[in-house]
């Protein structure tokens, strides 16, 4: 398969995520490496929607510390502690966090001052343990909704499947 990225901004979000899911699954067919998958997903999600920042923060000390992993965009924060900011909150509470206006989120970490909204999705290994979080930032307020939550949660389910 040729390595291509899709621009899906013109499609309704739910339809765009269905197309993106098929593209991610086809691209990662036969791959069992988590870092390769993170890099690939970051690229494909980022270019599909034209986000400000798209990437993973990996759990390096369970329950305590996240460290930047593969991403697309400007320089990311290098480390985030559990419970701090949107990423740390999603990791500590093991749940997707969708923030329409980052200025209203207590303790928001501004890695890039242009970020206005954010969604962070927990990523689990096949044994259910937390591997990372997927962080997506936008320059627009309220850029993310339920279609994004559902679509991104389905995408990162790739990591739960045993290989």
Which role fits each region the language model picked out?
Residues 124-138:
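Sensory-domain boundary capping and coupling elements
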Residues 140-142:
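A generic structural motif
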Residues 33-36, 82, 115, 147:
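A generic structural signal for residues located within well-ordered alpha-helices
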Residues 53, 120, 133:
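Short hydrophobic/aromatic beta-strand element in the GNAT-like acyltransferase core
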Residues 117-125:
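A short, aliphatic-rich beta-strand micro-motif
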Residues 59, 64-113:
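Regulatory sensory and allosteric helical modules in signal-transduction proteins
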Residues 128, 144-146, 151, 161:
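Well-ordered alpha/beta subsegment
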Residues 1-75, 154-163:
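Intrinsically disordered, low-complexity terminal regulatory regions
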């Amino acid at each position: 398969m040729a390595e291509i990225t899709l621009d899906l901004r013109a499609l309704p979000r739910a339809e765009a995520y269905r197309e993106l899911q098929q593209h991610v699954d086809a691209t990662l067919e036969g791959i069992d490496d988590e870092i390769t998958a993170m890099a690939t997903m970051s690229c494909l999600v980022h270019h599909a929607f034209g986000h400000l920042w798209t990437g993973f923060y990996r759990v390096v000390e369970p329950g305590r510390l996240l460290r930047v992993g593969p991403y697309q965009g400007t320089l990311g924060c290098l480390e985030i502690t559990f419970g701090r900011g949107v990423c740390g909150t999603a990791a500590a509470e093991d749940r997707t966090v969708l923030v329409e206006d980052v200025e209203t989120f207590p303790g928001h970490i501004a890695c890039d001052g242009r970020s206005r909204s954010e969604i962070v999705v927990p990523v689990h290994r096949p044994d259910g343990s937390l591997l990372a979080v997927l962080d997506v930032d936008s320059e627009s307020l309220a850029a993310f909704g339920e279609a994004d939550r559902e679509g991104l949660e389905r995408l990162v389910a790739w990591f739960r499947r045993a290989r």
